[in-house]
Amino acid sequence: MPTYEAFSSAELLQSLALEKMMAKLSTRRYRSGLQPMGQEVEAASASTSKSAVSRRFVRATEERLAELMGADLSGLDLVALLIDGVHFGEHLCVVALGVTMDGKKHPLGLAEGSTENSTVVKGLLVNLRERGLDVTKPTLIVIDGAKALSSAVLEVFDHPVVQRCQVHKVRNVKSHLPEGLGNTVASKVRAAYRLPSALSAEAKLEAIAKDLERAHPGAAGSLREGMAETLTVARLDVHPSLARCLRSTNSIESMTEICRDHSANVTNWSSGEMALRWCAAGMVEAKGQFRRVDGYLHLPALRRALEAEVAAAAGKGSPARTGGAGASEAAQAAA
């Protein structure tokens, strides 16, 4: 067993502080959480004081943030990019998660701010590009409905194919409805999203919107807004096992739940910088727990579908992200 002196070096104490704090041990309880190692603990008690541990944890999380935001991305064969906003207290971080052709998930970066802030989201995407991320290939971009985010994606990526998050869409529609009705409508919308084709799903969603438009025009308008983009994965005929991962930003929410779990003892998010450090440390920690996405063997088929989508859009002289063809077909099916 290593002696306590072996842990007195700044690097190892810093690593130990990060490990214990990420395991939800508070600075006050940190010392009691160490394994007993003899009288040397008492002699070196200054190394485990609340302020000393806090300083080491700050340095360790600063290193995790620098590691995350400085990683070389040039070797990633990205097929999908998920972007979402994550709350830490009153602070919001925009988080980017990539899926590569081998099915692995990669935390790519983050920025403090909202998906509604064009400067923030474009800055994050430009940072990914400057670190070597290939933005020239057709890529599935899974996002919420923030216009600033959509605009930034179009500016930075050469051939983005946008999938609007279905979970965000359901929440937005529910926010326009009384609680009881909201739950009923949400169930119907989710059932529509599970239909086997974009054609049938869009026809069903339009029928739901039509039922709502007189009594609840806000909900109807919310459902119709960006409807085709909520069905991009269905239109691309992505295998159902893979589609479950790519039709929403839930993979980011799962990752950030790990961040939140590690930060459960934090009661005062004093700054955006603190939120960035904790979030980055959690993202790096989460990477070690990731499994391949379900249905990853179908990623080559997704890439071919993305390439075909981009080629078809180029032939029509329109961006691939619009997904407009499905809307007219669905209307005909409904008629």
PLM regions with names:
Residues 36, 40, 195-335:
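Acidic/histidine-rich catalytic cores and adjacent linkers
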Residues 24-36:
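Short, charged amphipathic recognition helices of the HTH superfamily
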